[in-house]
Amino acid sequence: MPSKKFNGDPTTRELILKCARTEIDQYGIIGLRLSSVAEKAQVSVPLIYKYFEDRDGLLAVVLGDWYEEFVFRYRAMIDGWIDSASRITLEEFAQLSPKPQAGAMQKDREFRLQVLATALENPQLHRRIKALTIDAHAWSATAIDRVIPKLPESDRHFDRRFFSLLLFNTMYVFYDLLDTERIDDEQYISFLVHLVRASSHENFNARNN
């Protein structure tokens, strides 16, 4: 590991990152070759090493940036929705959870798994995703805090672990491999609402009896 960080030209650095991302889009994470990135960016491989130390260093930045964009795009969508709503039903709130049928999000969902798998062998990427995940978990708690006052009174008392633990960890890794026994989004939301509402009503009744 170099003892001194190489700053270099920000424009060149961004060009290398852009070309690396294009390579990953075309050939996947495993197919990323520094020689191809260098050719596209019209720089030398040794220069890439100066900026990113090695292939893992380049991957850590490119995939870390992608993961951050993925997380914050989702957060911005939810924040905007919560802020714009004066009242929220439990059914509407449940729509924000990950769903079995990813639709247009399927590609991102699959790529996210690849990024997480890469992070297991890439300490720099692992540290960045860990920090983003800790921040996202804290954000999810504040999002719940903002939603609860807008729900009907009897639906406000659910066990928060439905969202902070179960749904936070839901990725449908094995579900996507099934050919049968699949559930559509409407059925899933109905099932989720039933569980959360039952929890809320049980806690609500216990506090008022």
Language-model segments: residues:
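Helix-turn-helix
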Residues: T12-L15, C19-G57, V61
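Amphipathic alpha-helical packing segments from all-alpha helical-bundle domains
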Residues: V71-F72, A102-L113, P123-P149, S190-V193
